């Protein structure tokens, strides 16, 4: 995709695709920072890539998401470089749902089951909100509301 200064209407989808294309040119999926870590930095970005894919149907976007997840989740469904005691490392699990739906690959179900068990046992504050991390007692961070 080339970004030009023509008179084409610049819709939100136009800008979403421009952002996705830029990141895809800059980083191979498995190299998205922090490289080799199942983390919310990639999870939030790739959630946006998935929404862009849903709107425009460009299968390259779905393949990019799958490539990143497959670099973190092995054939047995084990997630490497994931701390289940941190919401930051649970957030990318949202990507596993569409991968399971579209591919039927059971590794994504096994990875989801692992994350579900972690979140069910995750510590909560008095109001029921999740602690940001197991080692941050009673701390509920704003981004944790999203995660």
Language model features with spans:
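Mature N-terminal, pre-catalytic/accessory segment of carbohydrate-active enzymes
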Residues: 1-12
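N-terminal basic, low-complexity leaders that serve as flexible interaction/assembly modules and, when applicable
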Residues: 2-4, 22-25, 31, 37-44
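A short, Lys/Arg-enriched amphipathic alpha-helix followed by its capping loop at the start of a domain
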Residues: 12, 51-58
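Long, well-ordered core segments of solenoidal/helical folds
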Residues: 12-31, 60-80, 110-129
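Short, hydrophobic transmembrane alpha-helix segments
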Residues: 31-34, 54-56
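Well-ordered alpha-helical segments within folded domains of soluble proteins
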Residues: 38-54, 84-101, 140-147
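A contiguous, low-structure linker/loop signature
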Residues: 85-125
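Flexible, surface-exposed loop/gating regions in the mature catalytic domains
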Residues: 126-145
